[in-house]
Amino acid sequence: MKRLGREFYNRDSLIVARELLGKVLVHEIEGQKVSARIVETEAYRGIEDKAAHSYGGKRTPRVEVMYGGPGFSYVFIVYGMHYCFNVVTREEGNPQAVLIRAAEPREGSELMAQNRFKKSYHQLNKSQILGLTNGPGKLCRALSIDKSLNGEDLCGSKLYVAEESQESLSIVTAKRVGIDYAEEAKDYPWRFYLEDSQYVSVK
């Protein structure tokens, strides 16, 4: 699989969010590879977007990586326990990002099962199998993504997104999830998901 280059990420988050669908997120951990096919994303358009951490040009140590240019990871924690993985888009100084909300397991399902449920994959029931990666926090836990990977270069060899040959995709557009604080921005249709995937977090 071909790794995505910097130019892929150096575009508006709305474009990148759609085009990440069907791509494969890969994390190489001490010689072991875990990967998952991206099936749900959300675009955050930075300074103009009331749902974005960088809205209004907000610049704190937490969001600094969003200002650093395209193709880097932005990992933050919610509720004090769940990590969320984002890819930074647009040029330096234009703090946009795409949240990866859900994915379908590809490689390393045994490690994912241990990370999520402390069980072997063959011990999981159907609900647990779908629950491996069908939400942003679940995805991060399954793929061993945490705060230590904040700012990771996604054009490197440790954490990256790769192309996968695929047929045409049926993409659904919807409102983003869990941003009721964002006033009118909570209604923007900036969430995208694959219609036929069972791993989408919310339909």
From Swiss-Prot:
InterPro entries: Formyl_transferase-like_C_sf, MPG, MPG_sf
Molecular function as annotated in GO: alkylbase DNA N-glycosylase activity; DNA binding
EC number, as in UniProt: 3.2.2.-
A single BP term in Gene Ontology: base-excision repair
DNA damage as UniProt keyword: yes
This protein's record includes keyword Transmembrane: no
Family membership noted in the UniProt record: Belongs to the DNA glycosylase MPG family.
Protein name: Putative 3-methyladenine DNA glycosylase
Species in which this protein is naturally found: Desulfitobacterium hafniense (strain Y51)
